[in-house]
Structure formats: structure tokens, C-alpha cells
């Protein structure tokens, strides 16, 4: 496995969700897995995927452990908003209309002021990237009156396999950055993904409109837990994720957002 430089998160490091999705596909065909990142993932370097059996695999850079994946044991279809979300431990927020998510994305602080983004070159959510150069263009913004951030996502054909479904690594990448934006507010130091657990529920199809949301779940010591969901146009969850984030060592806090830019839950994140 080689992570191409265009799939970066922080500078010179692979996007955690993208890498996690690639590794998850080695333990579960649908990408239902938990991936733990043990060290920054280098770009343009040949890495080795080693199956450990029993639905487990590791990613190695030479002899160094980079990441490890475990398949989720139970897969459920969602029949109501309260079913099948054991990954989060609680029901997710209600879905958001695409028009509302689109407007929230336009209000996103990093989209208005790139200095608010710790990694503006991130291929998923960086303001310096976009669909024209292979970026996903997902920059969630605050929804008035709700403790979550959202953006619309219309994945292009280039992200899909032959069946028209968006490949696992790109769905994971979208969930990764949505959760990060939802939980880690301006004023906090930059955080990086440590662990991501994803349960795919329905196909994500290229060319269709989706809503991606992220929100704060909990803060424990240095760690922040974030939830994220990709909703389809019917308001049903296509994929749900739980992410654990860790502060980047030695990083300075980000600039504060202008008044009104942060969601209602921002104070809890601080």
C-alpha cells in the first residue's frame, strides 16, 4: 500500500480516515471496522498490510507499526433512528436538509478564514483543496440552534468503483473530518485522529447528494470523542462513525472564530 501525497491530512501525513478506510477493507469487505493509528502515516512510501487472522490486520512501515484494524463483529440494518447505532452508544442527531447543510458549509469558519484551519491542505476539508484537484470539499459549518456542524457532499464519479458506490476509503475520510470539525472548535490546539470506528449501513452513490454531520460526544483528559454520520437524501444514515482525537504535541491554539461562528456546543469543547 502506498498513500499518494494528494491524500494528505496534516502536511506530509496521510489523512487518517482515508488510511483507515483502506485498511478496514482488508478486514471487512464493507469497511465495518475499528482502526487505531499508532503513528503518522507517511506519504509516497511502500507500506505493508499484514493479516493477523480473526478479522484483524496491521499496517507496517518496515518493522514499525503504523495502524491496526479490527472488523466489527455485528452488522445491522437501521430500521429507525434508534436502531443499529451501538457504534455511538446513543442515537445520532436528526438528519439535516441538504439546503441547510449547504448553507452551513458556506458559513464554515475555515472556508471564510483559512487561518482557522490547522491543516488547510487536507484533501477532505482543507480550504486550499477542492474537487478540481482531488479534494472532497467537505468543510462543515455550524447549524443555528443545534450542537453540530454540517455540509452537503456530492461525491464525484472518480471516487466510485465500477458499481457506482463511493469507495470505502472516501466514506471513511468524510466521516473522519466531519467528526473532527464537529468536536474540535477554534481556540483549541490542533487535534489529530487516533481511532475511528465506522459502520456502513447503506450504499453511498457517486453523483448523489448527501449530508455529512459531526458533533462532540465527550471530553476525557486529553482525548475528545466525536460522532459523525453521512445521511442520504431520504434522511437515512448511510454510514456512522465514532472518532477519538488527540492533541498534536507542541501545537499552538488556533485563532478564535468570530462571534456566532461556533455551534451552541462549542463551550463544552473548550
Give short role names for the model-derived ranges.
Residues 7, 11, 19-54, 176-211, ...:
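Hydrophobic beta-strand-centered segment that forms part of the acyl-chain substrate-binding groove
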Residues 189, 197-260:
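Accessory, usually C-terminal, subdomains that scaffold auxiliary metal cofactors
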Residues 4, 52, 72-74, 154-156, ...:
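Solvent-exposed residues in well-ordered beta-strands and their adjoining turns
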Residues 5-9, 160-161:
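Short hinge/gating elements
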Residues 1, 54-58, 70-164, 263-270:
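Non-catalytic linker/capping segments at the edges of enzyme domains
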Residues 25-91:
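Extended, compositionally biased flexible segments
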Residues 137-148, 161, 168-182, 187-189, ...:
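Conserved mixed alpha/beta catalytic, RNA-binding, or beta-rich assembly cores of soluble enzyme
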Amino acid at each position: 500500500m502506498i498513500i499518494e501525497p494528494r491524500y494528505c491530512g496534516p502536511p506530509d501525513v496521510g489523512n487518517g480516515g482515508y488510511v483507515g478506510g483502506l485498511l478496514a477493507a482488508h478486514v471487512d469487505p464493507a469497511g465495518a471496522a475499528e482502526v487505531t493509528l499508532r503513528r503518522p502515516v507517511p506519504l509516497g512510501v511502500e507500506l505493508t498490510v499484514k493479516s493477523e487472522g480473526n478479522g484483524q490486520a496491521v499496517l507496517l512501515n518496515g518493522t514499525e507499526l503504523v495502524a491496526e484494524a479490527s472488523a466489527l463483529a455485528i452488522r445491522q440494518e437501521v430500521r429507525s433512528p434508534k436502531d443499529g447505532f451501538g457504534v455511538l452508544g446513543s442515537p445520532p442527531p436528526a438528519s439535516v436538509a441538504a439546503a441547510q447543510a449547504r448553507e452551513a458549509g458556506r458559513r464554515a469558519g475555515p472556508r471564510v478564514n483559512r487561518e482557522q484551519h490547522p491543516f488547510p491542505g487536507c484533501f477532505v476539508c482543507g480550504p486550499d483543496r477542492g474537487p478540481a484537484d482531488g479534494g472532497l470539499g467537505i468543510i462543515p459549518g455550524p447549524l443555528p440552534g443545534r450542537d453540530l456542524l454540517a455540509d452537503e457532499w456530492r461525491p464525484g464519479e472518480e471516487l466510485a468503483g465500477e458499481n457506482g458506490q463511493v469507495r470505502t476509503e472516501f466514506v471513511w475520510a468524510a466521516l473522519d473530518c466531519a467528526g473532527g470539525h464537529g468536536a474540535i472548535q477554534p481556540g483549541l490546539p490542533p487535534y489529530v485522529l487516533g481511532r475511528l470506528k465506522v459502520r456502513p449501513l447503506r450504499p453511498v452513490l457517486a453523483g448523489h447528494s448527501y449530508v455529512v454531520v459531526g458533533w462532540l460526544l465527550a471530553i476525557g483528559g486529553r482525548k475528545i470523542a466525536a460522532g459523525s454520520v453521512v445521511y442520504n437524501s431520504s434522511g437515512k444514515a448511510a454510514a456512522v462513525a465514532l472518532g477519538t482525537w488527540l492533541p498534536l504535541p507542541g501545537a499552538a491554539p488556533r485563532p478564535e472564530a468570530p462571534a456566532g461562528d461556533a455551534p451552541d456546543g462549542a463551550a463544552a469543547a473548550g
